[in-house]
Amino acid sequence: MPTPFKLESRMRVPRTRLALAVLSSLPMVVLAGPVSAQAVPAQAPDGAGNATTLDTILVTGEKTARTLQETTTSVAVTTSVRIEQENLTSLFDILNRTANVSQMYGDRGFTIRGIANEAGAPNPLATIYLDGAALPSQVSDAGPTDLWDIAQVEVLRGPQSTIQGENALAGAIVLRTEDPTMDWSGRARVMASNPPDPRSAFAAGAPLVPDQLAFRVAVEDRDFDGYIRNPTRGTAEDARESTMARAKLLWTPAGIDGLSARLSYTRDDRDGPYMYAYSRRDVPDYYKDRINTSDYPSASDVLAQVATLEVDYAASDAWTLTSATSWTDTDMARSFDTDLTERPEAYGDTDEFYDTLSQELRLHYSGQRLRGLVGLYGSQRETDNSSVNRTNVDTPVSTIAAVLQGAGLDAATAGQLAGLYAQALPVIPVDYASRGTSRSRNLALFADVEYDLSERLSLLGGFRQDNEEYRFGATATAEFVGTLPDPAAFGPMLAPAIAGINQAGLGMVQQANGVTPGSTRVFDAFLPKLGLRYEWNDDLATGFVVQRGYRSGGSTYNIARGRNFAYDPEFTWNGELSLRSQWLDDALTLNANLYYIDWQDKQVTALFGINDYDYHTVNAGKAHLYGFEVEASHRVGAAFDWYSSLGYSRTRYDEFKTIVDAQIDDWAGAEFAYAPRWTFAVGGNVRWAENWVANLHATYRSSVSPGIGADARRLPARTLVNGRVGYETMDWTAYLFASNLFDEGYIQYSWDDDSPNVILGAPRVVGIGFEYRW
């Protein structure tokens, strides 16, 4: 089988005294800041291994297998070894430990380099892939992203539009599950913790036909009691139950040399809280005694199914043909309490359906000087979302005042009368129902190549010609269900005006009714990539790449107006410097990326004035961001290794265009929401007395603002410490673990400074686990 990446054996170039001087300062620099994707000691053929050599890590997220040191893209890799060492159980455990990546609303949403995966428009800016299948962003809080039987997780930072295509302007997260092997193997694990969160898991595989057909199955079950109690309903607010089941087949037929096929099916069934799990902070000791008083259940019932078929055929040592087929089907029912109180005033239910089918064909070439791929991609996505809810619309004082001025009143009188009306009717209760359907078809031709201009200098290039057809339609009904103010109660002089306001209010509700026939839009984009990579010696390489990022346009539904509104694509140009280095005879890896991104035609949400629901997406923003990531890992010896990461990201809105009739805040000079400037992580593994192991790691995130603008409130910085200690043999492991070891209290999100409702970070969790392997 040909190797799709270059692993040439070269004479080592002696390091200069200057290089040694730089090296001598690296441990202090890194401990004061840097980074890392975990690596483990390489094993010699006899199994003894080199206790101070790090494993070669392969990065596959760019669809060509390259070593981490050959990859110029900024990527953080978490292997199955690190998942076990740190007792990582969910994708967000990894994101919280990754440089320039941060959580947003608890387990709902994340940022990469300060860019939110969901921002400004329905389609995401970053996508999570499971075995090559793109997961809908709407299930990031309740999808199949737990880490049981996961082989590797790659967080690709920066535009991935050339290779991944749609919805990857900020980056991509690639999860690969464990493949079947031609040997019998298995593992089983049980975990228990306080607060109660029991988990049980099993994975096993074996050959069905020796050397030709093998299978692997994995199952995990969880029954979490939750952190938040609800005295109104007498239940837990954020309890979760989930069951994940996966089956995989590997086929390498003896009669077809060079052919391999992997078939995977995952079913993930979850019952849990709504995407945002709020607690009240207007109660004593709100961090330790978490309370939610909602009378209406805030819940999610999600069934996600993912199937993939990957076929590789090595026609020769140089040529390989790959076919990747994926299908995802997600059914989701959610309910929520909008007012978050014990009063039955505002609540709702949604039914959501997401279906995606994609097919990709790639031709890989690996020659002496030229390596790369060319591919064809096609996908079809369908969504069907329905909602029924009781909504309390804040009485729009400014809109009423404008109507009164249009009728001839002066501004002062109109404002005073509008204020009196709002006192009588502070909110407008509306029964609202809607259904929106969309279908998108994406076709693309793409290529990614590396050509050796000399023994050490390589040209990097690629492109994607992307075509998307998007169709969206919606229907909505709205009905006023409250009691209007009695005009007679305001006296004979004001009664006519109050009656007129009543009619205007009913007209506003009526305007939210609408039937919008499906409309189709087509987008084309050319996304180039060009760069250079120079290998100074076998252990040191630098690179520079410029590439274009892209998010397609589409249509959004304006609830208040009952209409669709179109918006156009947005683009970025990304320039990135990379450093890849190994030191101390490959015991220390130090990698870094420095980037600058220019963002044009940014998709933002604009208000149009009727009420709080009169908004839709427009292209009005221009922004830029810059920063760096540094990552290091060092195996000091058989008994100790450490790793660290440091990220810095500075985001800035530059200007906002004027949109007719729109109310767009001029955020020029402001930072993005949930864009921490600094992220830092450090950890280490200790081994002693043959069988004892321990891991301790800490993560830091600087302060962030959940809003945008000079007066936006900020959430304080937070530092979390986690640990694991255990006893390991060849067959079994018993261990203790703790997350948020010092029980640091921190807020993930709040409506505003005065709001009693907040999303809190997880408290300290202490538990035990046992795993058996065969």
Can you annotate each of these PLM segments?
Residues 371-373, 455-459, 596-598, 618-709, ...:
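Gram-negative outer-membrane beta-barrel transporters
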Residues 210, 234, 240-387, 404, ...:
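Outer-membrane beta-barrel domain signature, strongest for Gram-negative TonB-dependent receptors
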Residues 60, 92-133:
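Extracytoplasmic beta-strand/coil segments of soluble accessory domains associated
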Residues 124-125, 137, 148-157, 162-230, ...:
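Outer-membrane beta-barrel translocator/receptor signature
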Residues 228-236, 275-293, 337-347, 388-435, ...:
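Solvent-exposed loop segments that connect transmembrane elements
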Residues 310-336, 535-551, 558-559, 566-657:
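Membrane-embedded beta-barrel scaffold of Gram-negative outer-membrane proteins
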Residues 4, 691, 700-707, 727-774:
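C-terminal beta-signal and adjacent terminal beta-strands/loops
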Residues 1-98, 205, 257-261, 313:
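N-terminal Sec signal peptide and the immediately downstream disordered periplasmic leader
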